[in-house]
Amino acid sequence: HMEEDIATIKKAMTKISDLAGRTDAQSLNQIARWVTTKESHAQNVQETILNYFLAQRIKEKQKGDEGRQKYVDQTLLLHQLIVVAMKCKQTVDQSRCDAALKIVQNFTNSYFDDHGIDHIKSLKKG
């Protein structure tokens, strides 16, 4: 889901860059729509992290608790993804999308077990 949002953000960045410099009304309208699309999908990434992973799935671990380091690592990855999604809203630099995909992959590897990762891969193929 987040990977699809990031792919859409990257496509929007490409379209905005392609239309840059044009001043006719239709091009300006298309740019506005692509900016809205880009920002909407970046917001989707942030909301998925906040409302699903941080609020529901990632359980807080106190210092000394088993699994504390994994909790810290996952929380840091999610924070990085929230920040890079924000930066995607502010720019058309596609390297931000590449960074976001890398963070998603790192989080996926940390969050899911081997069975879950295999299931995700099978969904992408099918």
Residue map of PLM features:
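Mature extracytoplasmic or organellar-lumen-exposed domains after removal of signal/transit peptides
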Residues: 1-25, 31-126
